Design a protein with these regions (language model features):
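Short, solvent-exposed loop/turn segments enriched in Ser/Thr/Gly
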Residues: 18-27, 79-86, 132-143, 193-201, ...
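Solvent-exposed, conformationally flexible loop/turn segments
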Residues: 6-8, 77-82, 120-122, 191-196, ...
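Short, hydrophobic beta-strand segments
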Residues: 11-19, 125-132, 240-248
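Beta-strand-rich extracellular modules
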Residues: 14-16, 31-35, 130, 146-148, ...
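Short acidic/proline- and small/hydrophobic-mixed sequence motifs that coincide with surface turns
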Residues: 23, 38, 94-99, 137, ...
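Long, low-complexity ectodomains and other extracytoplasmic segments of secretory-pathway proteins
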Residues: 34-83, 93, 148-202, 206-207, ...
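Surface-exposed binding patches on compact interaction domains or structured appendages
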Residues: 1-7, 93-122, 208-237
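C-terminal soluble interaction/assembly domains
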Residues: 197-206, 211-280
Length: 280
């Protein structure tokens, strides 16, 4: 389907549910002539046994509008690019309204900026996050809805994950790129519940140029970073040491903590480190 520069094209997708009343998340890959990397479109939704009132279908309320989740995932993006997602908002009240947005994070854009929503109806907004080289990994972006000219008492939170972009790297740059090497799973000595456990990973750069660690990120608030590095020279190693608080961990349960390093290694832009805690 050809379309000229500056023009827009529309892709219509119909999901035929055969899995029953469950949430669904499907991916459609769109390929463009002259581009190796496809555009991945995510189609998400929920299937219910029967129709529910909007107030229940969209249970997170900001005044008279409702969303399905309190934190909206925009998606993944590489530096120099943007990520977008379409979000459905519901006017669950019995009165029409106008919806606009204010106090948005600098990298966040919501379109349309102003729209009218009839009573008991839904509308769609396109949320776009623009990358920023000062922001890596998972970041929060916020915007406050304004309903009929009145600012909501709380903001809507969006998340996006940003990693390095290697699409503009030359063959020579890729040949001389840093290469990380590490053991990605650690099982520290078993501890009693409530005791602290420590884990240390050693990351080696076996490439030809410095390995940059843009960000060290945890999936748990039970982790404390004791030692890290922001750059590892070729041939060098660096230690990443963590302390784990185990007061909420359970015996015979999955007590795995995940650490993610965001790097400039084309083969491992994200390094996942797993700490598996055993409670006695």
């Amino acid at each position: 389907m050809p379309f000229a520069p500056g023009e827009k094209a529309q892709i219509d997708i119909t999901y035929t549910n055969e899995d029953g009343p469950y949430p669904f998340d499907k991916t459609v890959s769109v390929y463009f002539e002259g581009h190796k990397k496809p555009l991945n479109l995510h189609i998400r939704g929920d299937v219910h046994k029967e129709a529910l009132p909007l107030e229940q279908t969209y249970p997170i309320h900001y005044g008279r509008i409702g969303l399905k989740k309190d934190v909206v995932k925009v998606g993944n993006l590489s530096q120099g690019e943007v990520a977008s997602t379409e979000v459905t908002v519901a006017n669950w009240s019995d009165k029409p309204m106008t919806l606009s947005w204010i106090d948005s994070t600098a990298e966040l854009h919501i379109e349309p900026a102003h729209q009218a929503i009839e009573a008991g109806k839904t509308a769609r907004v396109v949320v776009t996050v623009r990358s920023n080289r000062s922001k890596w990994g998972k970041n929060l972006y916020v915007s406050t809805p304004v309903i009929d000219g009145k600012k909501s008492g709380k903001c809507v939170t969006f998340t996006a994950i940003t990693k390095e972009n290697f699409s503009s790297w030359s063959v020579e740059m890729l040949k001389d790129a840093p290469v990380s090497k590490t053991r990605d799973v650690l099982l520290p000595s078993p501890v009693q519940k409530g005791e602290r456990s420590e884990a240390e990973f050693e990351v080696e750069n076996i490439g030809k140029t410095p390995l940059t660690i843009y960000k060290t990120e945890f999936d748990s608030d039970k982790l404390d970073l004791l030692k890290s590095a922001s750059e590892i020279r070729p041939g060098d190693k660096a230690a990443f040491r963590f302390s784990v608080r185990t007061d909420s961990f359970q015996k015979d349960s999955d007590n795995t903590c995940v650490v993610t390093l965001y790097t400039n290694d084309p083969s491992h832009p994200l390094i996942h480190l797993y700490i598996e805690i055993i409670i006695l």
